[in-house]
UniProtKB/Swiss-Prot annotation:
<feature type="compositionally biased region" description="Polar residues">
    <location>
        <begin position="78"/>
        <end position="88"/>
    </location>
</feature>
<dbReference type="GO" id="GO:0000398">
    <property type="term" value="P:mRNA splicing, via spliceosome"/>
</dbReference>
<feature type="compositionally biased region" description="Polar residues">
    <location>
        <begin position="27"/>
        <end position="56"/>
    </location>
</feature>
<dbReference type="GO" id="GO:0000381">
    <property type="term" value="P:regulation of alternative mRNA splicing, via spliceosome"/>
</dbReference>
<dbReference type="GO" id="GO:0005634">
    <property type="term" value="C:nucleus"/>
</dbReference>
<dbReference type="GO" id="GO:0030422">
    <property type="term" value="P:siRNA processing"/>
</dbReference>
<feature type="region of interest" description="Disordered">
    <location>
        <begin position="71"/>
        <end position="239"/>
    </location>
</feature>
<dbReference type="GO" id="GO:0005886">
    <property type="term" value="C:plasma membrane"/>
</dbReference>
<protein>
    <recommendedName>
        <fullName>Protein SICKLE</fullName>
    </recommendedName>
</protein>
<dbReference type="GO" id="GO:0016604">
    <property type="term" value="C:nuclear body"/>
</dbReference>
<feature type="compositionally biased region" description="Basic and acidic residues">
    <location>
        <begin position="228"/>
        <end position="238"/>
    </location>
</feature>
<keyword id="KW-0943">RNA-mediated gene silencing</keyword>
<keyword id="KW-0217">Developmental protein</keyword>
<comment type="subunit">
    <text>Interacts with ubiquitin thioesterases UBP12 and UBP13, and with protein phosphatase 2A subunits PP2AB1, PP2AB2, PP2A3, PP2A4, PP2AA1 and PP2AA2.</text>
</comment>
<feature type="region of interest" description="Disordered">
    <location>
        <begin position="262"/>
        <end position="299"/>
    </location>
</feature>
<dbReference type="GO" id="GO:0005829">
    <property type="term" value="C:cytosol"/>
</dbReference>
<feature type="compositionally biased region" description="Polar residues">
    <location>
        <begin position="285"/>
        <end position="299"/>
    </location>
</feature>
């Protein structure tokens, strides 16, 4: 009896502990459900581990080649942002800045004279062979990158002069002459909107440096290259397709051959048969001649047997 009562008490105690544990689990579950109702934003809240991962990036050639060295990480400073938005550049145009070797007064006077005499068309000039390399795509040298900004071109208003960032002589020393010794083939006069281009650049009769280059450009412009490397104009019209050898007589140096008839050859021959070449002449039978020769030299089998019988009978009769 005592054992059963002890067992009942132990079961009650275990049930009470289980019930208390279930109540605790229910309260913790509600708290966690309430806390998960408002999720945190991982983008707004950055942890220290993420910051460390951003600071220590992996070595990459295109991102930061010096990130692999520890000394560079210690001395690393935040880079300055030099790039400005295009909206600010468009809203506040910067006045044109001229090269130091060119006085701005002469440029303005030359530009006004050009605009008064027929409009400004040289800024939009682009030769046919320069579709891939226009003046707007050329970048200034390293000394002018931070100082020169061309003003925005206003197509609806009055024409605005866009200055060149540097003289042509800095970009291409011998821009007038191509590598074959010839000159450009498009426009042989420099643009008339500025005066410093003639003074500081070696024009050499060519507006753009690449307008007269390459062998492929000379093929479609009726020009050809000689042995000396220069260009010479091709003959226009149908004369290009004419040669003196076309009018010469092709039968001039040929000698005639007399023709012989087959009947004449047959009459002159001793056999009286028609003459035929050896390739198609009838061949004599070789087997008949061979058999005839062998038969004339040797006896046949019947003759040999008859002769042998005669000889045997003669020997018997003599004995």
């Amino acid at each position: 009896m005592e054992d059963s009562e002890k067992r009942k008490q132990m079961l009650k105690a275990m049930r009470m502990e289980a019930a208390a544990q279930n109540d605790d689990d229910a309260t913790t579950g509600t708290e966690t459900s309430m806390s998960t109702g408002h999720l945190s934003n991982p983008l707004a809240e950055t942890s220290n581990h993420q910051q460390d991962s951003f600071e220590t990036q992996r070595f990459d050639y295109y991102t930061d080649p010096m990130a692999a060295y520890s000394s560079f990480k210690k001395n690393k400073t935040p880079k300055q942002q030099y790039i400005s938005s295009p909206s600010h550049q468009g809203s506040s145009p910067v006045p044109p800045q001229f090269p130091p070797s060119v006085p701005p007064g002469s440029l303005c006077s030359e530009y006004q004279a050009q605009t008064n005499h027929g409009g400004f068309h040289a800024a939009h000039y682009e030769p046919r062979g320069m579709a891939h390399l226009s003046p707007s795509h050329r970048g200034p040298p390293a000394g002018w990158n931070n100082n020169f900004r061309p003003p925005p071109v206003n197509h609806s208003g009055p024409p605005q002069w866009v200055p060149r960032p540097f003289p042509f002589s800095q970009e291409m020393p011998n821009m007038g002459n191509n590598r074959f010794g010839g000159r450009g083939s498009y426009n042989n006069t420099p643009p008339q909107f500025s005066n410093y281009g003639r003074q500081n650049a070696n024009w050499g009769g060519n507006t753009y440096p690449n307008s007269g280059r390459g062998r492929s450009r000379g093929r479609g412009m009726n020009t050809s290259f000689g042995r000396d490397g220069g260009r010479r104009p091709m003959e226009p019209g149908a004369e290009r397709f004419y040669s003196n050898s076309m009018a010469e007589d092709p039968w001039k140096h040929l000698k005639p051959v007399l023709w012989k008839n087959c009947s004449d050859a047959s009459s002159s021959s001793s056999t009286g048969q028609a003459w035929l070449p050896k390739s198609i002449a009838p061949k004599k039978s070789v087997t008949s001649e061979a058999t005839h020769k062998t038969s004339s030299n040797q006896q046949s089998l019947a003759e040999y047997l008859a002769a042998s019988l005669d000889g045997a009978t003669c020997d018997e009769s003599s004995n």
